[in-house]
Amino acid sequence: MAGRRLHGRASFICGKAGAGKTTLARELGGTLPAVVICEDEWIDTLGFEIRSLEDFVRASSKWRSLIGPLASELLRLGVSVVFDFAGNTIKSRQWVRAVFEAANADHVLHVIDATDTQCLANNHRRNHEKPSGVYWGHVTDETFHGVTVYFVPPQPEEEFRILTHVRR
């Protein structure tokens, strides 16, 4: 239909390391349908060397400047997008908001409610199994606790449409 504009939906995920963000992103990508955009995969493919959290933050910033306009265009054209990255800070969620608002698209913030004990156990299992598609590497207990200090659950004043996934 000429002149008709469809807009996709942006889905993104908030959860601690080991909560199951990538697993949920893949599930969503297969059921919505949607294009899954995996930050870790892109950073790896683009050749960024990640040896520290600081390296990851720098690479992530460059990745976002590259992928943001593309994701907005996909959404504007009616393609739904699942962001497989940690929407764990207010700043990271503001970035996604800018992407979907630029496309006048809908959104859902998927929040994974998992205990630290569950996340640590999942990280231990993932470190042992080394499944394909996991690019951040070995997540030690020290790394988990180091990145968890930056975790900020979504606040009501952020005004996101939230769907909570309880992992107990």
Model-assigned labels for residue ranges:
Residues 13:
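Hydrophobic anchor at the beta1->P-loop junction of P-loop NTPases
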Residues 1-5, 31, 148-168:
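NTP-dependent small-molecule kinase module
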Residues 59-103, 107:
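Glycine-rich phosphate-binding loop used to anchor ATP phosphates in small-molecule kinases
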Residues 10:
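Walker A (P-loop) ATP-phosphate-binding motif of ABC ATPase nucleotide-binding domains
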Residues 41-43, 113-119, 168:
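Conserved nucleotide-binding/hydrolysis micro-motifs of P-loop NTPases
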Residues 102-152:
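A glycine- and Lys/Arg-enriched "phosphate-lid" helix/loop adjacent to the NTP-binding pocket
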Residues 16:
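P-loop (Walker A) phosphate-binding loop of NTP-binding proteins
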Residues 19-79:
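Conserved substrate/cofactor phosphate-moiety recognition/catalytic segment
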